[in-house]
Amino acid sequence: MREVITINIGQAGCQLGNKCWELFCLEHGIQPDGTAIANSNEKRSVITGGIDTAYNAFFQELQNGRHVPRAIFVDTEPTVIDEIKTGEYSGLYHPEHLICGKEDASSNFAKGKTGYEPLLNQTMDAIRKATENCTGLQGFFIYNSVGGGTGSGFTAALCEKLADKYTKKTKLNTVIWPSPKLSSGVVEPYNAVLNTHAMMKFVNCTFMVDNESIYKICQKQLGVHSPSYFHLNQLIAQAMSSITASLRFEGTLNVDLNEFPTNLVPFPRDHFAMMSYAPIVTPEKAIRQTLSVQELTSSLFDPNSLMIQCDDINKGKFMSCCMMYRGDVSSREVNLAVSGIKKQNTVPFVGWCPCSFKCGINSQPATAVPGSSYASTARSACMIANHTAMCQVFQKVNQNFDLMFGKRAFVHHYVGEGMEENEFTDARQDLYELEVDYANLALDNTIEGESMTAQ
């Protein structure tokens, strides 16, 4: 068995993680107390054509028949963890995997990174115990926001320890990136830059989403006038469900955890990917509208479907692209859809990389949580792509960082937690280089020029 352990950190990471596990349980026929719904495995076997035990990669099955998520939830203060402990799925998780401190990190990266050594050790101990229940650990899926102190600082400290202890295991990271128009804290640009710099060597691939993009999707495509974090997390969870479906269900063209960085990351530093999901439709619209595989594929490349805000994606080029299809989809239909995209020349790839699409198909259709604003459909798809337009994402946060750091605003809060001012300049320089890297990768002579220089 190739197990995956998910680690949910901070308020955003824990709330998103809880939504993901709610959806996973529905998809696998597991009730909120961890018991399996009668005949749920047989139903999955009919769809996949065999005995479906792949879900054990994400769930540990106990001797009493209960299924426990291979998941750790950690926050520096108890509010969100207490909500999970008293919520509908309180009986699902292992009690020792719901970890919290007593005081939050005050939206301060430095405090989150260095101020919680006992909590860090407790979390690493829980991870160690979780790995001992694995027969062949693939790696880790980490959920966090980089705007807050815990999500940025504590995540960086934890990933440093994970990289040291589990060096050869794959580490994937789903990051909620700061949105200037939906900011929850003025120092978010500091935390985002410091976290990205600190995590650069510790994560193999990062999936980027921001609340502003999800907010717009909820408004335009679902008609939710004032979306809450509840709506946003449900939508992100649906995308994460599609990304992990090949790990949790038996099916054709399965994607292994290690294949994400292999197929998405051309160079170790440039490991930041954007996501899109389709279709996002209301239950009323789903009854009237069924997209073909060709239409589904085309909608993935619509800028309005992207879950990260780019000023103009058409100014950049694709370096790599993974598409995960679910439900009533055949390999032939996918091949025809991809061929159609290539012929239209509307999806530009960099000249130094072959125009290749990594496609995965899973026959298990997506599931909608009862009462949610979006509907489950017969077929759906999710795209993850490494695109040179990511330079625009880093440019925005770098500019906002500079506006504050030029006046040394709020820097004393970080210095008071043990940081030095030069750590800000080092991190900012690193993000500038990352921004330039992504911009230069759009130039078709990038690799040729580098190889000529090397010779």
Curated annotation (Swiss-Prot):
Gene Ontology biological process terms from the UniProt entry: microtubule cytoskeleton organization; mitotic cell cycle
Catalytic activity: GTP + H2O = GDP + phosphate + H(+)
PROSITE patterns: TUBULIN
InterPro entries assigned: Alpha_tubulin, Tub_FtsZ_C, Tubulin, Tubulin/FtsZ-like_C, Tubulin/FtsZ_2-layer-sand-dom, Tubulin/FtsZ_GTPase_sf, Tubulin_C, Tubulin_CS
Major location (coarse): cytoplasm
Cofactor names: Mg(2+)
Cellular localisation: Cytoplasm, Cytoskeleton
UniProt entry keywords in alphabetical sequence: Cytoplasm, Cytoskeleton, GTP-binding, Hydrolase, Magnesium, Metal-binding, Microtubule, Nucleotide-binding
Entries under SUPFAM superfamilies matching the protein: Tubulin C-terminal domain-like (SSF55307), Tubulin nucleotide-binding domain-like (SSF52490)
Residues the record lists as binding GTP: Q11, E77, S145, G149, T150, S184, N211, N233
One family name in Pfam for this protein: Tubulin_C
Gene Ontology MF annotations: GTP binding; hydrolase activity; metal ion binding; structural constituent of cytoskeleton
EC number: 3.6.5.-
Family, as annotated: Belongs to the tubulin family.
Subunit structure, interactors included: Dimer of alpha and beta chains. A typical microtubule is a hollow water-filled tube with an outer diameter of 25 nm and an inner diameter of 15 nM. Alpha-beta heterodimers associate head-to-tail to form protofilaments running lengthwise along the microtubule wall with the beta-tubulin subunit facing the microtubule plus end conferring a structural polarity. Microtubules usually have 13 protofilaments but different protofilament numbers can be found in some organisms and specialized cells.
Record function comment: Tubulin is the major constituent of microtubules, a cylinder consisting of laterally associated linear protofilaments composed of alpha- and beta-tubulin heterodimers. Microtubules grow by the addition of GTP-tubulin dimers to the microtubule end, where a stabilizing cap forms. Below the cap, tubulin dimers are in GDP-bound state, owing to GTPase activity of alpha-tubulin.
Stated name of the protein: Tubulin alpha chain
Originating species: Entamoeba histolytica (strain ATCC 30459 / HM-1:IMSS / ABRM)
The encoding gene: A-TUB
